[in-house]
């Protein structure tokens, strides 16, 4: 059965020289049509060494079906491959951020965004056509500061559709229970959107390697709810960056071991988390 992301998957993992010019031209044309002179929503892609995945992501963004005026921007986060050339080839406005970390990249995007609402986009992820409008049903509410969604993985030779279904079902159930008291722990950058002015007020953490998304969500809690959207049509599809070379079973066991330690914590609210030394950004020389 065809999937909505099959076209994007056909160029996923290919270098810019391997993607047909006709597809790159199509992406360029559609991206240009999406751009508004007065955007209400800023959609910002961050990319570090994503030459082989970025074009597929941008293809999905070029086919968004939204009623909101939007801008789509890119951030090249000190890439050593041809990520920047992908941005150039499809004509997407982008910014170079030399300081390395997702926090620096997202902060760069935030500083340059013009929209009232800000959508975080990861370059290795495909976004469904109605993603923006469905997320906005939550984010546009006055008592909501930010919103997140669930996400899926695409099946491949080592990850079956059935295995992914079971893995995601268990994971989603855990996240659903956790979000009542610890919603900030359920937020992932690839499926995260917030009100721009509030994020600029609290700022995005740039001193940590991971978790800048959840940290930002925690900082936004005094200004409004952390909302979650449970809708199949608002579920992006991504690769295996969070699983790596592990099998689904290995990843599942690892998650159970990690989450099983102090599992009762998910039933109690928390307003502050201590940083671990290994997650701190080391000073660049």
PLM features per residue range, with description:
Residues 97-113:
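Glycine-rich, basic loop-to-helix element that forms the pyrophosphate-binding segment
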Residues 130-161:
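Conserved donor NDP-sugar-binding/catalytic core segment of glycosyltransferases
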Residues 149-155, 163-185, 189:
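Short, flexible, basic/aromatic active-site loop/helix in glycosyltransferases
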Residues 118:
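Short aromatic/hydrophobic "clamp" motif used to bind/position activated sugar donors
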Residues 60, 76-84, 125:
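A conserved acidic beta->alpha catalytic loop
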Residues 1-60:
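N-proximal low-complexity "stem/linker" segments adjacent to membrane-targeting elements
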Residues 209-216:
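Acidic donor-binding loop at a coil-to-helix junction in glycosyltransferase catalytic cores
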């Amino acid at each position: 059965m065809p999937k909505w992301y099959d076209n994007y998957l056909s160029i996923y993992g290919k270098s810019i020289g391997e993607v047909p010019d006709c597809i790159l031209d199509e992406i360029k044309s559609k991206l240009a049509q999406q751009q508004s002179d007065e955007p209400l929503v800023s959609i910002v892609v961050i990319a570090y060494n994503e030459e082989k995945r970025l074009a597929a992501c941008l293809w999905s963004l070029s086919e968004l079906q939204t009623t909101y005026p939007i801008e789509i921007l890119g951030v090249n986060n000190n890439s050593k491959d041809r990520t920047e050339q992908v941005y150039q080839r499809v004509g997407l406005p982008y910014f170079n951020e030399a300081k390395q970390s997702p926090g620096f990249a997202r902060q760069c995007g935030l500083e340059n965004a013009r929209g009232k609402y800000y959508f975080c986009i990861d370059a290795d992820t495909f976004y469904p056509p109605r993603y923006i409008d469905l997320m906005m049903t939550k984010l546009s509410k006055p008592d909501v500061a930010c919103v997140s969604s669930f996400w899926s993985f695409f099946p491949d030779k080592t990850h079956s559709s059935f295995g992914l279904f079971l893995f995601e079902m268990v994971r989603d159930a855990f996240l659903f229970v956790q979000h009542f008291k610890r919603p900030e722990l359920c937020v992932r950058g690839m499926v995260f959107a917030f009100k721009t002015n509030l994020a600029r007020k609290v700022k995005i953490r740039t001193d940590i390697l991971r978790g800048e998304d959840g940290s930002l969500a925690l900082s936004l809690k005094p200004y409004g709810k952390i909302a979650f959207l449970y809708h199949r049509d608002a579920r992006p599809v991504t690769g295996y960056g969070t699983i790596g070379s592990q099998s689904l079973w290995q990843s599942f066991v690892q998650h159970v071991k990690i989450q099983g330690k102090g599992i009762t914590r998910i039933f109690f609210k928390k307003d502050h988390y201590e940083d671990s030394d290994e997650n701190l950004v080391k000073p660049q020389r």
